[in-house]
Structure formats: C-alpha cells, structure tokens
C-alpha cells in the first residue's frame, strides 16, 4: 500500500521481536536475581538449613548435605511412613541423600554421573513437591513441581 510506512507483516515481525526481547530480559532478570541472592547467602558448616538457596550453597560449598537431613531408610528406622509426617519421628529433620534416577532424562547425563535428592522447605506434615537434585560432579538443580521441571542453581 502506497503511503504507508509499515505493512502488517512488518508490524507482526516487530511485535515478535519485542516479545522475544521481553522474554530474554525476563529470563536475564530471573538469573540476575538468583545470582544476587546466592551472593548474599551465607552458610556455616554444621548448621541446619532447609531453604533452597541455603541448602544449594551448602552442597556447593561443603559437597554434602547439612546435618539435619536423613535418608528415607534412616527415617523408616525411626518409624516414619512414606505418607506420614517426618516431624513426628524425627523433629527438625528433612529427607535427603537418597538416589535420584533421572529416568526421564530431564537432567544432563554423563558417564559416571549420579544424582541424589533432598527435600526443600520441609517443616511439618507431609512432604511437599520442592526438591534439590544434585550430582556427584557438582551440578545442583531445583524443582518445585516434583521433578516435572528444573532450574539450574550451580
């Protein structure tokens, strides 16, 4: 059309470009927020932690879980049932240190790599869907939807 500086196709392409830039900015700001929180987070060896940032940093720094985590087998020995509340048999403890199979292949695979998992933000009652999954070679991922999606932390 003469006299028009923009065609509908040009406007569509510009809208797509703007949307892509916004997604990129949002992803970047999310990553920047995570990095800023990691920089502010401090952990001490031997202390108990249950939050995402603190437990991830503890694993990253000390290459082990904080001492307030026990495996499912250890919890069962104390009388815990998988659908029951851990706090009744092990006050102050969280489940962690058990093998994670990565059967769906959502996490990066590499020869010799193995994964373990731990609960995040457990206080009392039944376990929630939040987990950290960490590898024997330093990778740490977070899921808040019981392994359907992951966010890389380290």
Summary of predicted features, one role per range:
Residues 24, 67, 103-104:
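Short charge-dense sequence patches
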Residues 4-8:
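Bacterial signal peptide processing site
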Residues 14-64:
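N-terminal low-complexity, Pro/Thr/Ser-rich intrinsically disordered segments
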Residues 73-154:
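Functional cores of ribonucleases/endoribonucleases
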Residues 65-66, 79:
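Active-site-proximal polar cores
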Residues 11:
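Winged-helix/helix-turn-helix nucleic-acid-interaction surface
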